[in-house]
């Protein structure tokens, strides 16, 4: 069983909603010690960074990721949030729990974990990291505020990975 999967979701074409995509690219650079960036092919599905860490990216969480989650000891979910959450960066432990959604295409991290637990009898220890977004226009650029928060999130993730090694 691998140690970590880091799951990012959000729309990189909508400004700060792409913060997870930015962080995953930075993780590849940090952990691979190169300027390698995710390619279009690698943007869907699981990408192996090293023997302990994989990353996954999509526009939204999908039920199929539950099968993958069952193969890891730890999971970190990355997403953007709006001003409805007061913290600029929220880091919180999440547990398997089905959460009903008014949208048929929307799953929460807790619901994905619950599916993994119910179907595959294992869900990883999981953390949700959400980063405050300030602009969500059509753009592939992060706002300065969100970029700074993304770098803080990257430091937090690296510390979590290093603690388990």
In which residue ranges do the predicted regions lie?
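N-terminal catalytic or cofactor-binding beta/alpha core of small enzyme domains
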Residues: 1-124, 128-131, 140-152, 160-164
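Glycine-rich phosphate/diphosphate-binding loops and the adjacent beta-loop-alpha structural elements
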Residues: 137
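Hydrophobic "lid"/C-terminal helical patch
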Residues: 157
């Amino acid at each position: 069983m691998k140690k970590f999967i880091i799951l990012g979701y959000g729309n990189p074409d909508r400004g700060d909603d792409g913060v997870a995509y930015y962080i995953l690219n930075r993780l590849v650079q940090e952990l691979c010690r190169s300027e390698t960036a995710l390619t279009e092919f690698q943007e869907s599905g699981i990408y192996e960074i090293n023997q302990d860490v994989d990353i996954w990216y999509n526009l939204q969480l999908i039920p199929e990721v539950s099968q993958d989650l069952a193969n890891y000891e730890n999971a970190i979910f990355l997403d953007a949030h709006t001003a409805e959450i007061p913290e600029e960066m929220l880091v919180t432990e999440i547990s398997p729990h089905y959460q009903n959604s008014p949208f048929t295409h929307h799953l929460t991290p807790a619901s994905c974990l619950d599916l993994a637990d119910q179907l595959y009898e294992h869900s990883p220890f999981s953390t949700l990291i959400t980063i405050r977004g300030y602009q969500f226009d059509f753009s592939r650029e992060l706002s300065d505020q969100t970029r700074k928060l993304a770098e803080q999130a990257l430091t937090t993730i690296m510390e979590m990975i290093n603690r388990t090694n």
